[in-house]
Regions:
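PLP-dependent enzyme catalytic core of the Aspartate aminotransferase-like
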Residues: 466, 479-516
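Conserved PLP cofactor-binding pocket of PLP-dependent enzymes
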Residues: 83, 450, 459-490
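Conserved glycine-rich beta-strand-loop-beta hairpin in the small C-terminal domain of fold type I
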Residues: 387-402, 413-432, 438-447
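N-terminal small-domain helix-loop-helix segment of the aminotransferase-like
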Residues: 37-170, 515
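Eukaryotic N-terminal low-complexity, Ser/Thr- and Lys/Arg-rich leader segments
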Residues: 1-75, 79, 228-240, 294-305, ...
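Conserved core of the PLP fold type I
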Residues: 14-15, 20, 26-29, 109-274, ...
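Conserved core segment of the aminotransferase class I/II
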Residues: 5-33, 311-395
Length: 516
């Protein structure tokens, strides 16, 4: 399966026009797709979902005029025979203090004994001119890296409509903040899981955007609760929510992964109520599967690994109502601050209107590093092998943390669901204790109950810190803090040394017991 797809893209590259060159050249996913234009339906128009700010934001004339390659009427790049720029305030490369960059990295399967691979990039080279990489870039990214990412998206997700685009971002957090502003005005509502990524919550709060939390179970957001809350929406609360932010795989903080059937039901509700979906999926490739069997020491074959990945919302999106955010922070390195998003061309163009006067483009250093690693050194096969290797490594770490929890956290103290993806274990503290300061727990008012729960959570957090173990409070992730019920805590198996889990969980267990 993978080998045939790679062969198809190799042939497609060999018969395609050369990549656009020069400073900040216009480029587009349309140049690199295997599927011919016009073979799938077009996306819907989303003007009615855009914020006032987004509708008023226009492309940057200065950025458009500065591009060395521009689109023609048919969308194809116009490449002039000769061009002298007396317009752009772009420094001449002779004044850049760097001439070359040399990176050393791992083979794709990630073995620590692998011989290092050297990846140079030099000024004036045909492959990716380092001088061009260091200059102002095009908002969608460099043609070299965008080609690889477009192929990757088509290979893995194959969006079922025609006019989809991928563009690079300066990290998913930055892209997420921009997308919220594109779709929401002050006073609007967005939908999230009842426990959600704090970065999203903290991004929308100062924008005056309200959050509607939807109940969750072991598979994440519950579509029946979503449908019920939308169907019974009271217009006195404001405009009915039209945007939903979700993390469908290894959800942060709960670790829940939505099944294929769950996703189809949620997408159907979105279609019926005209909801635009922000699919934030940094843990998609960290598929953990069941717990490792004794003697299972190697990652699974790449085709089997790919078959077991769940269908993304992008892969089932027939109307262009999904913007998918992919991250490098969990699969390459957080400091790259270079990721990608995929959506219909209308939304991609609106997004680039923002970046042209904001981040402009992802770092040229990061784009070079990613291109030289992903395309030149690994290729698509090597990239997938790396992802399968990472999944296997995190699977071992997940198993080690769960084993330590089974050893020190009895079910009368905590319960949890073993995560199928991601980096997190979500602990549910069983019934709070008599130390809650009410005449009787059942008689506490809602406000007293909330105060008591937060107080106990704070004491557990501080006691754990005193014992040398950092945990995350569940209240940090509550989409609607006023609806807080019970005490939940998040542990991660991503950071600490593997051999420290046993000690850390024991200390944490002692900290909890000392406060009960």
């Amino acid at each position: 399966m993978l080998s045939q797809a790679i062969a198809d893209y190799t042939l497609h590259r060999s018969t395609s026009d050369p990549l656009p060159s020069g400073p900040a050249p216009f480029t587009s996913s349309e140049f690199f797709k295997l599927c011919r234009p016009g073979t799938k339906p077009k996306a819907k128009n989303w003007d009615h979902h855009l914020s006032t700010e987004c509708r008023n934001r226009l492309p940057s004339n200065l950025k458009a005029s500065a591009s060395s390659v521009k689109p023609g009427l048919d969308g194809a790049p116009i490449i002039p025979q000769r061009q002298i720029s007396l317009g752009a305030g772009r420094p001449i490369p002779e004044y850049f203090p760097w001439d070359s960059l040399e990176l050393s990295g791992k083979q794709s399967r990630g073995s620590p004994v692998d011989e290092a691979v050297v990846m140079p990039c030099t000024r004036g080279e045909d492959d990716f001119d380092f001088a061009v990489a260091l200059n102002y870039g095009y908002a969608a990214g460099s043609p070299q890296l965008l080609r690889f990412i477009t192929e990757h998206i088509e290979m893995i997700h194959n969006p079922p409509y025609d006019d989809w685009e991928t563009c690079l971002t300066s990290g998913t957090t930055s892209a997420m903040d921009t997308v919220f502003r594109m779709f929401c005005d002050r006073g609007d509502w967005i939908i999230t899981e009842e426990y959600s990524y704090p970065g999203a919550i903290e991004a929308v709060t100062p924008l005056g955007i309200n959050i509607l939390g939807i109940k969750m179970d072991g598979q994440g957001l519950i579509p029946e609760d979503l449908e019920a809350k939308l169907r019974s929406w009271d217009s006195a609360q404001g405009r009915k929510p039209s945007v939903m932010y979700i993390v469908p795989c290894g959800q942060n903080p709960t670790g829940a992964t939505q099944s294929a059937e769950r996703r189809r039901k949620i997408y159907q509700v979105a279609e019926e109520h005209d909801i635009y979906i922000i699919e934030d999926d940094p843990y998609y490739f960290l598929k953990l599967h069941s717990r490792l069997e004794s003697g299972e020491v190697s990652p699974m074959p790449v085709d089997e690994y790919l078959r077991q990945l769940p269908p993304s919302y992008l892969s089932m999106d027939v109307s262009g109502r999904v913007v998918r955010l992919d991250a490098t922070s969990k699969i390459l390195a957080p400091g790259l601050r270079c990721a990608w998003m995929t959506c219909c061309s209308q939304i991609a163009e609106k997004y680039m209107n923002y970046t042209e006067v904001g981040s402009v483009a992802p770092s040229g250093f990061s784009q070079v590093a990613m291109y030289k690693l992903l395309d030149v050194t690994w290729g698509h096969d090597g990239f997938i092998r790396w992802l399968a290797f990472l999944s296997h490594q995190y699977r071992q770490r997940r198993d080690a943390l769960v084993s330590a929890c089974e050893k020190y956290l009895p079910p009368d103290l905590f319960t949890w669901v073993v995560p199928e993806a991601g980096m997190f274990l979500w602990l549910h503290l069983q019934s709070p204790t008599p130390r809650i300061s009410c005449s009787s727990y059942s008689e506490c008012s809602i406000e007293k109950e909330k105060t008591a729960l937060l107080d106990l959570e704070e004491r557990i957090y501080n006691r754990s810190m005193e014992k040398g173990v950092v945990i995350s409070k569940g209240s940090w992730f509550a989409a609607e803090p006023d609806q807080l019920k019970g005490i939940k805590l998040r542990l991660t198996f991503a950071t600490a040394p593997l051999d420290s889990f046993d000690w850390a969980v024991k200390q944490f267990a002692d900290a909890v017991r000392s406060e009960l």
